[in-house]
Amino acid sequence: MAGTGVVAVYGNGAITETKKSPFSVKVGLAQMLRGGVIMDVVNPEQARIAEEAGACAVMALERVPADIRAQGGVARMSDPQLIKEIKQSVTIPVMAKARIGHFVEAQILEAIGIDYVDESEVLTPADEENHINKHNFRIPFVCGCRNLGEALRRIREGAAMIRTKGEAGTGNVIEAVRHVRSVMGDIRLLRNMDDDEVFTFAKKIAAPYDLVMQTKQLGRLPVVQFAAGGVATPADAALMMQLGCDGVFVGSGVFKSGDPARRARAIVQAVTHYSDPDMLAEVSCGLGEAMVGINLNDKKVERFANRSE
């Protein structure tokens, strides 16, 4: 995905466009973030640090995923006042998270002028069966996935950007790698299939046939795909780009580290120069202590990625 041509948008009527905002417009807005880093922030000061480091957008939160894991309880949409304060402090786009299936939280976020909504498994799901109908909103939505079928189901619902779910708040990139390799592996298989095999494959992965065929023709997802969940170092970020992602979300990895400003700049540089080992070595030096990671082999660790299908 990284380093390929312009991301195609739907032109064949595959997705129903609402009067609120055509899907192609939302896909175009998401595409503007391609090649960038989106950073979680919990206050205006952190937002300014992220912007100065070169982030293409920030995610406004009350608690970063590492704190959500540590503190437990029910994680909900952030206070709209905090989101407004963060939005007023920067000139780059601001995202915010809504609970899976909680369309009223999404309505509130749209009403306060947020730029993108992340329907996120990091927050406690509000609906175990249904995701938000994202076609009912003007603003673009981001959704997570673990595999190609999940990605295409979210796109059918109106997601304009897909990210790996990974395991946010762990500082451990293994699940993000697993998820992007799963998506990319299925796309490689799909590209080599005869057209008459696509029906069976679409049924197997429980994805809409027209989107599966479009993915086959494009050789990639029809929307931008970012990496998320456990990215903590410049090397992690470059790894995800080399695996084919269009950009990177960084959550706890920046502001839970020893020198957030320096690490933020380094990760932005790593995403920009992801294929240059000399540059990656340079930006990886002297960053201070990385966030404390979590071993995902521990069965007691809650898997956020399993909260939805």
From Swiss-Prot:
Disulfide bonds: none annotated. The active site is at 97 (schiff-base intermediate with d-ribose 5-phosphate). It comes from the Eukaryota. Gene3D superfamilies: Aldolase class I (3.20.20.70). InterPro entries: Aldolase_TIM (IPR013785), PdxS/SNZ (IPR001852), PdxS/SNZ_N (IPR033755), RibuloseP-bd_barrel (IPR011060). Induction: By stress treatment with salicylic acid and ethephon. Keywords: Lyase, Pyridoxal phosphate, Schiff base, Stress response. D-glyceraldehyde 3-phosphate binds at residue 181. Its EC number is 4.3.3.6. D-ribose 5-phosphate binds at residues 40, 169, 230, 251-252. Belongs to the PdxS/SNZ family. NCBIfam families: PRK04180.1 (NF003215), pyridoxal 5'-phosphate synthase lyase subunit PdxS (TIGR00343). This is Probable pyridoxal 5'-phosphate synthase subunit PDX1. It comes from Hevea brasiliensis. The gene is PDX1.
